[in-house]
Swiss-Prot record:
Its main location: membrane. Keywords: Heme, Iron, Membrane, Metal-binding, Monooxygenase, Oxidoreductase, Transmembrane, Transmembrane helix. It comes from the Eukaryota. This is Cytochrome P450 71B34. The gene is CYP71B34. It is found in: Membrane. It is a single-pass membrane protein. Belongs to the cytochrome P450 family. InterPro entries: Cyt_P450 (IPR001128), Cyt_P450_CS (IPR017972), Cyt_P450_E_grp-I (IPR002401), Cyt_P450_sf (IPR036396). The keyword Transmembrane applies. Its cofactor is heme. One of its GO terms (molecular function) is oxidoreductase activity, acting on paired donors, with incorporation or reduction of molecular oxygen. It is an enzyme of class 1 (oxidoreductase). The chain crosses the membrane at residues 1-21.
Amino acid sequence: MTNIWLLSLIFVICILVAVFNHKNRRNYQRTPPSPPGCPIIGNLHQLGELPHQSLWKLSKKYGPVMLLKLGRVPTVIVSSSETAKQALKIHDLHCCSRPGFAGARELSYNYLDIAFSPYDDYWKEVRKLAVQELFSSKQVHSIQPIKDEEVKKLIDSISESAAQKTPINLNKTLLALTVSVVCRTAFSVNFEGTVLNSERFNNIVREALEMLGSFSASDFIPYVGRIIDLLTGLQGRRERSMRDLDAFYEQMFDLHKQKKEEGSEDFVDLLLRLEKEEAVLGNDKLTRNHIKAILMDVLLAGMDTSAITMTWAMAELAKNPRVMKKVQSEIRSQIKNKERISFDDTDKLEYLKMVIKETWRLHPTTPLLIPREAMSEFEINGYTIPVKTRLHVNVWAIGRDPDTWKDPEVFLPERFTDNNIDAKGQHFELLPFGGGRRMCPAVYMGTTMVEFGLANLLYHFDWKLPEGMKVDDIDMEEAPGLTVNKKNELILVPTKFLDP
């Protein structure tokens, strides 16, 4: 009997010690600093229309690792290159999955795309497929004739405006260019003159990107949040955006069948063939919804991001005549009197590459990288990041960090002279395409499109402000959304520089 009591006592003591150690361990865990929030909504009210700017201001007070409570969801914001490196490289495998979001769930057919899919075998296989068939260096070089043709059309169109001294809306002009290139690349269809080549299509793209980037109450406040989304009209906007996109996908499939250009199998052909063969990616049999979700990434991101970067670059150049003159001088001295700029010509344009990097620094197309979700516990700067915590990397804030960049608000491409900083995800001071396993797979395609487009605009034309407008009148306000474009349209007047 004595032995039984002794064993029981030892067992109880062991349990108490284990509980004490667990509580003690939790007490030693460091929680990132956090701004005070409100009951129920937490810090949601502090995000504002442009969350990346609001979070940047908060980080000045609370530091580069900051914890917010967005409703009931713990969310960590990192705002420096060092903390981004810890999240995206050192602890990449701990936090490379995606949390659920209402907008992404609906527009990606329940996370069947690449960008918003959780980290699993399906994501690995579909990303690999997209890289091999669409985004590889070989594929990018193979579509150069398409870019040559579309840029020639652009130059001819602008030349007509220049002859009449008509101002150009560069937001719309550059979006039309990237739409044409991406659609011909993915669908082998020239959409010029079709229903897809319209202002309505551009509006659908912008609305979808805004829905993907919006902070929805239903994502953070269970039950009540959905009612809030219904009352504010956000749920209706998401459903309408989904219907509009789905209808356009179907129209694209129809156009693809009717007007397909002659040539080898394109990306859509491949996906449709895999669907017919009942191919399996991960544990999923490929369906039409899988194809639409994958195309959402290709179309929305591919069309929008390159156009946004070119628009911001032209805005900064118009605002900084010294830089405009210097980059045009480089391009024209290297290209001489050639009628057209070739793909290989852009390799020589070092200052243009600096201009693009500086544009990415100040105007990253995705200022808040798509959030990650912690799959296991890890630490950043000694702060514990628990499982299921959401993690945002504020690329916009990193580009304005005075500890990394001297005079961060000044547009100064020369800051990239004699350094090896690039946008390939290994230099965490500059992350326009993200980093780690979830880095955008279209880095090479996006970079070459921006270089080629800007080189042609700056080679063939001089650009002036409309009559009566001064440099200080150029505003740099941002529009909300997953990707952030210039809020107000950039209007410039082209003057033909070279008549081949």
